[in-house]
Amino acid sequence: MPRRKDIRKVLVIGSGPIIIGQAAEFDYAGTQACKALREEGVSVVLVNSNPATIMTDLDIADQVYIEPLAWDSVAEIIARERPDGLLPTLGGQTGLNIAVELSEKGVLQDYGVELLGTPLESIKKAENRELFKNLMLEIGEPVPRSTIAGSVEECLAFAGEIGYPVIVRPAYTLGGTGGGIACREQELVEIAGRGLKMSMIGQVLLEQSVAGWKEIEYEVMRDGADNCITVCNMENVDPVGIHTGDSIVVAPSQTLSDKEYQLLRSAALRIIRALKVEGGCNVQFALDLNSMAYYVIEVNPRVSRSSALASKATGYPIAKVAAKIAVGLTLDEIKNPVTGKTYACFEPALDYVVVKIPRWPFDKFGSADRTLGTQMKATGEVMAIDRTFEGALMKAVRSLEIGVDGLHLPGSAGWSEMELEEKLSYPNDLRLFAIAEAFNRSWGMREVAQLTTIDYFYLSKIRGIVELERELQAAGPRPPRELLRRAKSCGLPDSLIGRLTGLPAREVHALRKEYGILPAFKIVDTCAAEFEAVTPYYYSTYDDEDEVAVSGRPKVLVLGSGPIRIGQGIEFDYCSVHSVWGLQQEGIEAVIINNNPETVSTDFDTADKLYFEPLTLEDVLNVIEKEKPLGVIVQFGGQTAINLTAGLAALGVNILGTPVEGIDAAEDRDKFEKLLTGLGIPQSEGRSAVNVEEAQAVAEKLGYPVLVRPSYVLGGRAMEIISSKTELVKYMTEAVQVSPRHPVLVDKYIRGKEVEVDAIGDGNDLFIPGIMEHIERAGVHSGDSIAVYPPQTLSREEIDKIVEYTLKIGRALKINGLINIQYVVDNGGVYVLEVNPRASRTVPVLSKVTGVPMVQAATRAMLGRSLAELGYRPGLGPVGGFIAVKAPVFSFEKLGLVEISLGPEMKSTGEVMGIDRSFPGALYKAMRAAGLKVASGGRVVFSVADRDKAEAVSIAGEYAALGYTLHATPGTARALEKAGLEVEVVEITDPVPLIRSGTVGLIINTPTRGKVPGRPGFLLRRTAAEYRVPCLTSLDTARALAMVLRSVRWGGEPAPVSMAELFEKEGTANCCLRKKDSKAAIF
């Protein structure tokens, strides 16, 4: 069928901020789809609230709206833009839910907007648990015994009938949100109560547990002519009972017989046909280990995390094909861009193995419940490709960046037999390492299989790696050639082989070269080499034949940022992609290394060459030796890439941008202090300490409170405000591993206004596109603060000082590329808090709101362009006539036992932006986009520490004036009553009944005695997170929210506005567009 000519304009809904369960895969999918639609001559209108995405760049769609993802906001955009069609299936669960609401509210019908891709009825049948169950039974597909419940009482009745355990699955939710496995009545009451609240329609599916069965996924495609194909089948190493986003996944499946494979493939195709999905669809099955019995667990009628993995695993561009199907094309009409010859109706074939391992945030949250179940907890994932399962597994493990290069965790040898058995029996993030430890202790295969319910195939492979390590240990410092080749084929890195044999890693490398054991690079081509591929997408393996053709063009290697984790998110992938575009603008061949299957940087057509590899010194050097680039760019890959700088430089690799000495001077505390003193720039007083005694001495001299943190970290990991000697000793002995090589920094804590600057340097001078002011005072991590552009409360003198200090620091460090500096402003004084000689998470926001393509400009500066050549003058850039507010987004409800109060260690998983002509309007949009829903009236509960009571009085007065009823804990209530406010006293010894009552609209709580689990304040905050009641732990945020509520009450809600409209009114339209052919992108 030819493309439909009646579809001229399409509205695409993005997925919003990165949260657990919905990450960068939707930026990749949305970007690919927007480009595909425009290739077909369709005008694209995009709405998304996430400024850190490539898809919200001005040249990805014809009109870009960075607005809250709520049905009424999208309805206003529909009224303005009048699209012919709406494509919601690229926006994750958020996009589907909005589409359903728009239809139910009559918006789509009123404006004649057609839902493209998957019909509304199909979405409802897949998402509504009862309709889905009925459809499966109609077509003869088996589903576990289940019931639909709208109350806790109904859940208890069903569980009483079929027995425990039971699985709770809320309708219309993401990443298993609110779900879980209940093994007893009390657990069911808690899980079902939470799940009902989190479901958009107040409905949960209660089903018999098939935990322990094998979990298999099929990614399938269907077009409007009912042509269907299977793109990829994937096998979860972990059994049913663990969310697939928290499972190790292998593609293609390794343990299915052909009969089982075909049985489930046929079922997947029957299901996509019955649902009438047009586009991509993910089907999940539970397969009995001992028979051919299976159940259908779930269907996602949209692009998903699994489809991103399937797409990167096979090279098949699922999102692109889905977008073209949505406008009428069929699979046999859509050319596969990977081969340039075959069509999308050809099923991909794989001649390699892909392994995905989730990246969990437990290194950030030591107190979190690490048990894995049906509710997802991972923030991101890594993917690895090799010719063997072992090779792919070991690559994936070292891609995680968790301080290990193999299957042995530091400290695992010290686990008792009982601890080890517990780690094997109860799924958790350490189970892979526990399996290796069990085999290391010569536990039997049968025993490990019974405890884990993991297939013998995978266990035998892990045991094989452990036995190989023993052979290497026995071989000594010169292992024989065949043993070394076997070790490299199984994915063991030189560093691990070196430790086992007693050789330094460089000597292992030299021995490999002597033996002729070198990696070969293979191409991902979707067709197992049946057709020649035209897209350069490679992986390494220890094989004789190499498939990479190295060009004679000048080339530069960009290091990506690896898996998404707290502190290092999608912002750095945005920067990596823009760096690639900057290189291409200059006619340089752009080569990128990354291992994250969710991102735009690992899409088949982003860079000139993509290497899907771990970001370790050995793996990066393999690519450098192959490609021989002019230099390597490390600035845009977050701490992942920065940490490789010294090792690469020591081996003679040319690091482009800021000199290594400049990076070291900024990161090394003592060197940096001397630099600032020499420049006459004040900073918060502090010292480094290499042991507990030194830290105590520094803290005593400075006076408490002090801010402590390790050096060379990102996202404020292990950073804390310490108020006493006892807290300091606890921190030094438990939170960090301090040593002369890894000192701890101890600073005097200044509680002023925090300000953030990003600047572009050419090695001599700096251009500052903009300054951002934080709403929360210093002490809250910049990634968790609400930030405003341009600053709203700084004086001219303070801004001038910030600009002066930034220029001085940049010149002294010879910044070439990007630099991020954080300041604290206190009583007119400006103090340097931190300097990062690299891209920061605010770069995408500033690029979008100033119109300055910061990363492209920085990349071109690294290639020798001066600021003048790029069209910039040193100093601060002009300020536009609108306000932008960046707000953090958290995923606390997914992580049990995690403290939600804000501090110097970053906790947010994503961010949103609000943009408007007024500050209250922009702040309202940002808060709404972040999911802060506060009723226009009702109860506000105050419970604040003694130090905050005086300030809380005025804030409580503002909420009272807005008509809210004040409630407070006894101590806080006394302070409010003393100020003449009417307040009702509440006790929070057990906060669950209060919050579960549904009468509390907002909680304002500041911690008193640290963050101790079990204390009433901690329980109040945790319960609020789990029941989605807004809980603010910063009085600055509470005051800002009161201002927003007042503004909306008197002035109404601000209207949506497109980015192009804002820039046109400023006379700067299109100044941040990407153009490959000229300098017009910058002038």
UniProtKB/Swiss-Prot annotation:
Residues that, per the record, bind Mg(2+) 1: 284, 298
GO biological process, one term: 'de novo' UMP biosynthetic process
Annotated spans, Oligomerization domain: 402-548
UniProt keyword Nucleotide-binding present: yes
Residues bound to Mn(2+) 2: 298, 300
Carboxyphosphate synthetic domain: region residues: 1-401
Keyword Cell membrane on entry: no
EC number: 6.3.4.16, 6.3.5.5
Binding site for Mg(2+) 3: 822, 834
Residues the entry annotates as binding ATP 1: 129, 169, 175-176, 208, 210, 215, 241-243, 284, 298
Positions with a binding annotation for Mn(2+) 3: 822, 834
Residues the record lists as binding Mn(2+) 1: 284, 298
UniProt pathway annotation: Amino-acid biosynthesis; L-arginine biosynthesis; carbamoyl phosphate from bicarbonate: step 1/1; Pyrimidine metabolism; UMP biosynthesis via de novo pathway; (S)-dihydroorotate from bicarbonate: step 1/3
Residues that, per the record, bind Mg(2+) 2: 298, 300
Cofactor binding note: Binds 4 Mg(2+) or Mn(2+) ions per subunit.
MGS-like domain residues: 932-1069
Record remark on domains: The large subunit is composed of 2 ATP-grasp domains that are involved in binding the 2 ATP molecules needed for carbamoyl phosphate synthesis. The N-terminal ATP-grasp domain (referred to as the carboxyphosphate synthetic component) catalyzes the ATP-dependent phosphorylation of hydrogencarbonate to carboxyphosphate and the subsequent nucleophilic attack by ammonia to form a carbamate intermediate.
Function in brief: Large subunit of the glutamine-dependent carbamoyl phosphate synthetase (CPSase). CPSase catalyzes the formation of carbamoyl phosphate from the ammonia moiety of glutamine, carbonate, and phosphate donated by ATP, constituting the first step of 2 biosynthetic pathways, one leading to arginine and/or urea and the other to pyrimidine nucleotides.
Protein name per its UniProtKB record: Carbamoyl phosphate synthase large chain
Gene, per the UniProt record: carB
